[in-house]
Amino acid sequence: MREILFFGLLSICIFLVFFFYKQKENNIIYNRIVEKFEDNVVIDEIYTHLFKDSNLKELVFIKSQLIIPELEHKKMIKATGYRADAYKALSTVYRFDFKVHDNKILGFKSVIFEGFEDAKVSKHENNLPSEKWQQLKDFNIGDPNINEKFFHLEFPFVVKNTLCVTISKGFFKKIKKLKRLKIMLISNEDREYKIDIENFLPKYNL
């Protein structure tokens, strides 16, 4: 009986060591959030890659789905018009969030995906009306100077800066084919933050 118990505990320990090794190897934290309001549903799938040795702390990929049954039906029957067209453009949104820690508030004037240096980039605010999003070509990095009046300040604590980059469905399909994600962020101070990691996107049903 003791031998059975011993080997049972040993098997569990081996499994846990393997599990945590795989988690560390992949370095990806997955989270799924489902929110319902009336008959509508919002589903966020969130993939977080953690970095340890630089001011760039996290790369977060988010796939957001908005499901509105009434408009979902219209989309299926190929309806047109402002609401139907806006829903088609916004029902699934792909986004990267880059989290950079510093003692200053940062702006980011450029984002470069290696292999797609000629990508078409927009720089409008994320809260503009949906017709702007219908015109999204490759990706949007937001207004790099929105917090310009604070750029000169230095703080005695860590400032957690987040750069949100919304990407089009077409551009998402392109980067999903890459073996590695090589991305460079350039701040308002011309500091470069480089990412070179295995492309985890093809591993998931996105």
From Swiss-Prot:
Which is one Gene Ontology cellular component term of this protein?
cell outer membrane
Q: What is its main location?
A: membrane
Residues annotated as signal peptide: 1-19
Where is it located?
Answer: Cell outer membrane
Keyword Signal carried by entry: yes
Which keywords belong to this entry?
Cell outer membrane, Membrane, Plasmid, Signal, Virulence
Query: Signal among the record's keywords?
Result: yes
Here the disulfide bonds are none
The organism's place on the tree of life at top rank: Bacteria
The free-text function statement in the UniProt record for this protein reads: Virulence-associated protein essential for survival of the bacterium within the tick host and therefore within the natural life cycle of the Lyme disease spirochete.
Q: Which family does it belong to?
A: Belongs to the BptA family.
Q: What is this protein called?
A: Protein BptA
Organism in which the protein naturally occurs: Borreliella burgdorferi (strain N40) (Borrelia burgdorferi)
